[in-house]
């Protein structure tokens, strides 16, 4: 097990923290860090008490970890646990806080705009609503890399017009990286066309 040496932190004047969105979860995450910092499990206990189920158990066992209603509160709690470890170690206070999708809630908690307890309740509800909106396996998302945004939109329109189900550009992550979302068959069809077009 390796210990964290806070003396190696860069003393930057402009630091930003960007909290991750869904998809960054892994069974057993933060287990090693929890052995070094009691605040990790304390953060999970605080969030678990607010939400009414054991988030640490889900993170460590993987039971339900890929169900959105559980994934989101676990990831939010993990982000805040890491944030608190950073502060405990005397890490530089960031000038900017941001988050990608679900990570926006982590940024709000870190900024003191939202309590962890309220935030885990919100993201649990958010996850339930997302899960209910599309039955398991009926919908999908995928990142298309290496194509112009307009080409991705064109491919989505082409597939949707062929009645393979609806698919749309859902998120423009960066130049040449567009996330698409829609019916599973339609997303797969766009992915296939994207590969044919050099994506």
Region locations from a protein language model:
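Helix-rich "cap/lid" substructures immediately adjacent to catalytic or cofactor-binding pockets
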Residues: 4-98, 180
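Hydrophobic side chains within alpha-helical segments
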Residues: 75, 82, 107-109, 121, ...
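Short, glycine/charge-rich beta-strand/loop segments that flank catalytic centers
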Residues: 62-63, 98-102, 127, 139-143
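Short, function-defining helix-loop hinge/capping sites that tune catalysis or transport
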Residues: 29, 72, 109-112, 133
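Alpha/beta catalytic cores of group-transfer enzymes, especially the acyltransferase/condensing modules
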Residues: 23-24, 49-51, 111-199
């Amino acid at each position: 097990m390796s210990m964290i040496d806070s003396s190696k932190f860069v003393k930057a004047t402009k630091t930003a923290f960007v909290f991750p969105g869904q998809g960054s979860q892994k069974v057993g995450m933060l287990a090693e860090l929890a052995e070094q910092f009691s605040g990790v499990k304390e953060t999970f206990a605080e969030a678990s008490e607010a939400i009414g189920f054991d988030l640490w158990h889900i993170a460590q066992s993987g039971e339900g970890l890929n169900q959105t209603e559980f994934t989101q509160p676990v990831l939010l709690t993990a982000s805040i646990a890491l944030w608190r470890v950073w502060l405990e170690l005397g890490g530089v206070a960031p000038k900017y806080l941001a988050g990608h999708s679900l990570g926006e809630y982590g940024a709000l908690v870190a900024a003191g705009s939202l309590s962890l307890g309220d935030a885990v309740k919100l993201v649990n509800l958010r996850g339930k609503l997302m899960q209910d909106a599309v039955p398991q396996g009926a919908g999908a998302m995928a990142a298309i890399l290496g194509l112009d945004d307009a080409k991705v939109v064109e491919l989505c329109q082409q597939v949707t017009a062929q009645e393979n189900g609806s698919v749309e550009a859902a998120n423009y992550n960066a130049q040449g990286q567009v996330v698409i979302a829609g019916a599973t068959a339609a997303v797969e069809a766009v992915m296939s066309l994207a590969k044919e077009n050099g994506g």
